[in-house]
A protein has these predicted regions:
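Extracellular/periplasmic Venus flytrap/periplasmic-binding protein
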Residues: 26-28, 36-141, 159, 177-183
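Short, ordered loop/turn segments at secondary-structure junctions
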Residues: 1-2, 24-25, 70, 151
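Venus flytrap/periplasmic-binding-protein-like
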Residues: 20, 26-27, 101, 143-165
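A structural micro-motif
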Residues: 17, 37, 91-92, 144-145, ...
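Extracytoplasmic "Venus flytrap"/periplasmic binding protein-like
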Residues: 4-21, 32-34, 135-145
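Rossmann-fold dehydrogenase core element
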Residues: 38-41, 163-175
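Hydrophobic/aromatic residues located in beta-strands of well-ordered beta-sheets
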Residues: 19, 39, 65, 146-147
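Short beta->alpha connector loops
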Residues: 1-3, 46-47, 127-128, 152-153
């Protein structure tokens, strides 16, 4: 993910070896410099996905959002991008929480989110760990809409989350459903 790609950029540049980075953060390609010229990002920028999520929020009357994301560059970049775009759209972030990829519980963070009574919650995580805050919100009775980043667009999210993640809103690449797209 993002932390790994950022961590090896210097080594790839020194070796003159191109690196394919399946990450959302633009930090691996911007600002362009000698080490970033070796990185080729394969997924959409977080800003593009954030814009789509915010458009959906606006369309559905969301005025307040709780944010919970990884306590690493992925989560921090998402908070930076999303908070700026949300503010422009008139959406207020009423709670902001972080968690580690290895956490076994986010009960404390979810309690703080619930106390803020947001219209919706955005989970900024990737892979299997996207399920933990989502299912914890559901288990504690949260009734608002739950949004996920394109980091949740993976089979593990559905497999691990099961029925508790039904109704999730996320934006992702057509590559995920390419066989279903008409020619």
């Amino acid at each position: 993910g993002s932390p790994n790609a950022v961590g090896v950029m210097q080594f790839m540049a020194e070796a003159g070896t191109p690196m394919l980075a399946p990450v959302g953060t633009t930090a691996v390609v911007l600002p362009m410099d000698e080490k970033r010229r070796w990185v080729f990002k394969t997924t959409q920028n977080d800003a593009l996905i954030s814009d789509a999520l915010i458009a959906h929020m606006v369309k559905h009357g969301v005025r307040t959002v709780g944010f919970i994301g990884f306590n690493d560059p992925y989560g921090e970049n998402w908070y930076t991008v999303f908070s700026a775009q949300a503010q422009k759209a008139g959406i207020r972030i009423v709670a902001s929480e972080r968690f580690l990829r290895s956490d076994g519980s986010v009960a404390g963070q979810v309690a703080k989110l619930m106390a803020a009574k947001p219209d919706a919650v955005l989970v900024a995580a990737a892979g299997g760990p996207t399920v933990l805050p989502h299912t914890t919100l559901v288990d504690t009775g949260y009734k608002g809409r739950i949004y996920q980043t394109h980091g949740a667009a993976a089979p593990d999210f559905l497999r691990l989350g099961g029925a508790k993640v039904e109704g999730t809103v996320l934006a992702a690449s057509l590559m995920l459903v390419l066989p279903e797209v008409a020619d």
